[in-house]
Amino acid sequence: MSVVITIDGPSGSGKGTICRLIAEASGFELLDSGALYRLTALATVEQGANSADEQQVAGIAASLDIKFIPQEGSTQVMLAGKDVTKAIRAEEIGMLASTVAAYPAVRQALLDRQRAFLTAKGLVADGRDMGTVVFPAAPLKIFLTASAQERANRRVKQLEQAGVASINYEQILSDIEKRDEQDRNRATAPLLPADDAVMLDSTALSIDEVKQQILGLAKARQLF
């Protein structure tokens, strides 16, 4: 039987990094569901489509030509044969991704696509509704959080490491708080922990401490 570990949580909580580390440690496949919504947002912009037209955006989501290529310490994301790993991480694409993710037709278009990532090898799934909607029967569900201030600090460090010259902490914090509000209050698949999820606050924890806690939970459940 295929095993899936879901890790849900708000933007900037460290889901992506932790999921990659858990996948490496377990030998499981990796699903970055947030990237699918960011890819949909980017493709919508690049095609000059109307982002307010739910059916048009859903059509784009259904026909995405995407590929995830594992790299040392990261994952390369390809859209129609083009490397968009950095492009999908732009703040404006993240905000638009949150908007299009609220469309039921878009979520439905991507649902089967996400479930298809689960193979006999096992899967670590990163997102906002992995444990509640996409993989509700997962034997281990994590809801990873951190304070908005800590998540803004992490984003600032990411941008500094990427060589971004002009960084506005207050704007980044405001964007995170707006996105949290959007994600929590959308009508379809709002950002909420599954009833049986393990709540894990990473505000005062290192990446390795979070990783070890999750690996401990997985091993206690004999998932690998």
UniProtKB/Swiss-Prot annotation:
GO terms for cellular component: cytosol. It comes from the Bacteria. The keyword Manganese does not apply. ATP binds at G9, P10, S11, G12, S13, G14, K15, G16, T17. GO terms for biological process: nucleobase-containing small molecule interconversion; pyrimidine nucleotide metabolic process. Signal peptide: none annotated. InterPro entries: Cytidylate_kin, Cytidylate_kinase_dom, P-loop_NTPase. CDD domains: CMPK (cd02020). It is an enzyme of class 2 (transferase). It is found in: Cytoplasm. Keywords: ATP-binding, Cytoplasm, Kinase, Nucleotide-binding, Transferase. Coiled coil: none annotated. GO terms for molecular function: ATP binding; CMP kinase activity; dCMP kinase activity. It holds the Pfam family Cytidylate_kin. It catalyses: CMP + ATP = CDP + ADP; dCMP + ATP = dCDP + ADP. Its EC number is 2.7.4.25. Gene3D superfamilies: P-loop containing nucleotide triphosphate hydrolases (3.40.50.300). PANTHER family: CYTIDYLATE KINASE, CYTIDYLATE KINASE/PANTOATE-BETA-ALANINE LIGASE. Belongs to the cytidylate kinase family. Type 1 subfamily. NCBIfam families: cmk (TIGR00017). This is Cytidylate kinase. It comes from Saccharophagus degradans (strain 2-40 / ATCC 43961 / DSM 17024).
